[in-house]
């Protein structure tokens, strides 16, 4: 799946719908950005936007929105209940999927540098992007707000990270940085506000004070009573769900509730949640209850049920899980893998250089892993092979994962070839040489990745050959031969492209790695076939 970053800019306008809509349009019109939510507040005179995209697109979206704010918002006339210091007050970048915090820090720095250069405004870094302790938190930087900014900018220690140390009355200054995804999460308690707050004091990081900290890191919380639901809630913010997961919070609150002889009536997530957080919860309950669930949709369903996420209102994964709200159109991102079998085969046989052997090898390897998984499924859950269930639980996940991981390489190989041809067509010069080298190495690394992923299957396949349902013997044989053929085909692509590579060290290390994988595949195939040949009912 592609990289996904969330951006949550707060603009100092919550009353003028024309301006609010203009900023929304700037985000929507940015290629690669998906606007998920617009939340204006009249009393705060502030609007919070939530949009997502890949790292490059997300920065462009933030820049386009800020340019509109620079033109339309006049801070000399701004009044509202919320603290602020600029037309764009704060612009955090948040990792959602396949993105590191470091990449989000880079997004914030690129945004700060580019916007300060393009419209000439002061930009401060905060949270993970800041390296100075006295100006790391938003409240530290924003102290004094817009009204105190002119004098603040005169101090050397408050020199902006980007842009001029100059007060711009109509704009002010902005803060940008990177932070973890914040999850607003409430656990429902059949009790009083005071009892819910007692639980909150037990679990939140701050606890009851410095001398009595709570049990869970990166957690803020209070207790309150919700008349609409007729129950109390432990209302919390998870500042880092990777360190303290939703399931951990639910279990800890439930434990304290039991000790107080209180009932727990599920929980609710307010706003959006990353898929990863839900899958982490599912994996926890799968391990706790010794379940065997591979399918993602079933994992999501399990987490919803165990956490009671639909207890207050229906939890619709398609509308509440951020990854599903920006579901990639596979016909666009993976056109080859989305074709019919007939269509793909006919395209292979057409008068075009791509798709070719590399894409075919990825498909053949994926089918090989798939047939290995099929053998496992034809064994697992059957009364006749009940004694083998624990073994199938071990073997099925890596084969299923390899099958799914290989499918995108059908398109990736063709894309890499096309990028190389494009680089070859650029005008001669140093930039052309750099572009060709980069594209060529990508055209080598893609089939090498096909080999690496495929190579992870041999251990499970050797064991599957020993224990799998013999009624699927021929399926497993075809699968293993397909996997070996896919590896061989990818090896041929690696080898042919290495001939044009001028980086001797890269050629040597890649050749060695590819040859080792091919040798292992050929030897492993023979072992599997021998095991199957010798097995009897």
UniProtKB/Swiss-Prot annotation:
In this chain, the stretch annotated as Cyclodeaminase/cyclohydrolase covers 336-537
The annotated region (Formiminotransferase C-subdomain) lies at 182-326
Q: Which domain of life is it from?
A: Eukaryota
**One GO term of the biological process aspect:** L-histidine catabolic process to glutamate and formamide
Gene3D superfamilies to which the protein is assigned, alphabetical: Formiminotetrahydrofolate cyclodeaminase monomer, up-and-down helical bundle, Formiminotransferase, C-terminal subdomain, Formiminotransferase, N-terminal subdomain
Region Formiminotransferase N-subdomain: list its residue ranges: 1-181
UniProt GO cellular component terms = centriole; cytosol; Golgi apparatus
The EC number of this protein is 2.1.2.5, 4.3.1.4
Where would you find this protein in the cell?
A: Cytoplasm, Cytosol; Golgi apparatus; Cytoplasm, Cytoskeleton, Microtubule organizing center, Centrosome, Centriole
Q: What UniProt keywords are attached to this protein's entry?
A: Cytoplasm, Cytoskeleton, Folate-binding, Golgi apparatus, Histidine metabolism, Lyase, Multifunctional enzyme, Transferase
UniProt-listed Pfam families: FTCD, FTCD_C, FTCD_N
Q: Where is this region: Linker?
A: 327-335
Q: Which InterPro entries match?
A: Cyclodeamin/CycHdrlase, Formiminotransferase_C, Formiminotransferase_C_sf, Formiminotransferase_cat, Formiminotransferase_N, Formiminotransferase_N_sf, FormiminoTrfase_cat_dom_sf, Formintransfe-cycloase-like_sf
For this UniProt entry, the molecular function terms from Gene Ontology, in alphabetical order, are: folic acid binding; formimidoyltetrahydrofolate cyclodeaminase activity; glutamate formimidoyltransferase activity
Oligomer status and interactors: Homooctamer, including four polyglutamate binding sites. The subunits are arranged as a tetramer of dimers, and form a planar ring-shaped structure.
Function of the molecule: Folate-dependent enzyme, that displays both transferase and deaminase activity. Serves to channel one-carbon units from formiminoglutamate to the folate pool.
The protein's name? Formimidoyltransferase-cyclodeaminase
Species whose genome carries this gene: Dictyostelium discoideum
């Amino acid at each position: 799946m592609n990289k996904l970053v969330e951006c949550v800019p707060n603009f100092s306008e919550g009353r003028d719908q024309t301006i609010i809509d203009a900023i929304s349009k700037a985000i929507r019109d940015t290629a690669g950005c998906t606007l998920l939510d617009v939340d204006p507040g009249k009393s705060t005179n502030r609007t919070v936007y939530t949009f997502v995209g890949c790292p490059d697109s997300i920065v462009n979206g933030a820049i386009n929105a800020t340019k509109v704010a620079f033109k339309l918002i006049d801070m000399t006339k701004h009044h509202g209940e919320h603290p602020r210091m600029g037309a764009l007050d704060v612009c955090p970048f948040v990792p959602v999927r396949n993105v590191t915090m470091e990449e989000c820090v880079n997004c914030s720095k690129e945004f700060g540098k580019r916007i300060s250069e393009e419209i000439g405004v002061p930009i401060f870094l905060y949270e993970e992007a800041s390296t100075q302790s006295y100006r790391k938190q938003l409240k530290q930087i924003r102290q004094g707000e817009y009204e105190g900014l002119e004098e603040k900018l005169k101090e050397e220690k408050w020199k902006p990270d980007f842009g001029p140390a100059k007060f711009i009355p109509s704009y002010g200054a902005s803060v940008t940085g990177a932070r973890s995804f914040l999850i607003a999460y409430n656990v429902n308690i059949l009790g009083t506000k005071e009892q819910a707050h007692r639980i909150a004091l037990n679990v939140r990081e701050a606890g009851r004070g410095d001398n009595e900290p709570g049990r869970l890191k990166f957690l803020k919380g209070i207790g309150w009573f919700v008349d609409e639901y007729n129950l109390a809630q432990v209302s919390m913010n998870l500042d880092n769900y990777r360190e303290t997961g939703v399931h951990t919070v639910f279990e800890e609150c439930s434990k304290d509730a039991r000790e107080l002889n209180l009932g727990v009536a599920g929980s609710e997530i307010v706003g959006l949640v990353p898929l990863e957080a839900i899958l982490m919860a599912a994996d926890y309950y799968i391990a706790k209850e010794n379940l065997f669930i591979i399918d993602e949709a079933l994992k999501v369903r399990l987490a919803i049920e165990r956490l009671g996420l639909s207890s207050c209102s229906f939890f619709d994964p398609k509308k509440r899980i951020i990854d599903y709200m920006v579901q990639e159109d596979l016909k666009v991102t993976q056109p080859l893998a989305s074709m019919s079998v007939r269509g793909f085969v006919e395209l292979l046989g057409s008068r075009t250089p791509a798709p070719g052997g590399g894409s075919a090898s990825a498909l053949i390897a994926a089918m090989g892993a798939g047939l290995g998984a099929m053998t496992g499924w034809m064994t697992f859950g059957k009364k006749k092979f009940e004694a083998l269930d624990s073994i199938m639980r071990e073997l099925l996940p890596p084969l299923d994962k390899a099958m799914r991981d290989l499918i995108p390489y059908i398109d990736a190989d063709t894309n890499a070839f096309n990028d190389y041809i494009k680089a070859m067509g650029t005008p001669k010069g140093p930039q052309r040489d750099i572009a060709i080298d980069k594209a060529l190495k990508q055209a080598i690394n893609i089939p090498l990745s096909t080999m690496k992923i495929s190579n992870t299957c041999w251990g499970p396949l050797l064991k599957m050959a020993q224990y799998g349902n013999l009624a699927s013997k021929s399926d497993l044989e075809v699968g293993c031969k397909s996997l070996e053929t896919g590896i061989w085909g990818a090896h041929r692509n690696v080898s042919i492209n290495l001939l044009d590579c001028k980086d001797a060290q890269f050629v040597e290390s890649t050749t060695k790695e590819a040859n080792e994988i091919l040798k292992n595949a050929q030897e492993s195939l023979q072992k599997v076939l021998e095991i199957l040949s010798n097995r009897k009912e």
